[in-house]
Amino acid sequence: MFKNIYQDKRVLITGHTGFKGSWLCAWLLDLGAKVAGYSVDVPTKPSHFEALALANRIEHFQGDVRNKDSLRQTVDRFCPEIVFHLAAQPLVRKSYEDPALTFETNFTGTLNLLECLRNQPSILAAVLVTSDKCYENVEWLWGYRENDRLGGKDPYSASKACAELISKAYMESFFKEKGPNIATARAGNVIGGGDWAFDRIIPDCIRAWSEKKSVAIRNPNATRPWQHVLEPLSGYLTLGQKLYSENSVCKNQS
């Protein structure tokens, strides 16, 4: 799978303690990669990261992507060949409660990571994960396309659009002729085992039903696509493989 490209490769994952990040750690370990992770904390109790005892199976670095010096020191210490950037403030409701934190994490955190990519010669490929909510929401019935307008009517969505813009600027300004091949990936809502986060429809339903309570749906009139967590992760891994092995121009993949 993935042409054995990850075997013995040094792979850094930001946001590795989260739902998708912990699944990505486990998959990369199974592929034979040497994995390191950088995250501010374990976001839920219980957590998929702790259930898999990943802190004992990878190089586990605790730090905030908003702290550029801490992130740079981690990158310089581990010297990764491939990077997956998943660290984020991922919740729309929290983005209303703390918009500054959301922009600092999702935009400035991405900027700090891009600076590491620019200055660490060991890195040959990087996948920067954003969101399908980076598009301007015009309430049409079909899926958004690569050439649709970026936007965001809430702080979370706008922060992801900002992350896309800064990533594109670095691609065009610094990585066209030298440096790592990088791409962004825009996934939608994910479901699957190991997700204990709040403001996620399936965990919220299970918690409410187990306590014989009604389920509080944040926006019952919304329509959103869902995919199993392993589907976008397979896309990230395929994209990372192509960026690393083929020096391809796989820019802004959704």
Segments from the language model and where they lie:
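A structure-centric signal for secondary-structure junctions around beta-strands
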Residues: D8, I123, G179, K212-S214, ...
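N-terminal Rossmann-like NAD(P)+-binding domain of SDR-like oxidoreductases, especially those catalyzing
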Residues: M1-A187, S234, G240
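Alpha-helical substrate-binding/gating segment
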Residues: P203-V215, W226-S254
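Alpha-helix N-cap/helix-start motif
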Residues: G21, S95, N137, G194-F198, ...
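C-terminal structured domain segments across diverse proteins
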Residues: E146-D148, S159, I182, A187, ...
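Glycine-rich "substrate-gating" loop/helix at the edge of Rossmann-like oxidoreductase active sites
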Residues: K153-Y156, A187-D199, N219-E231
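Aromatic/pi-system hotspot detector in well-structured domains
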Residues: T102, F198, S254
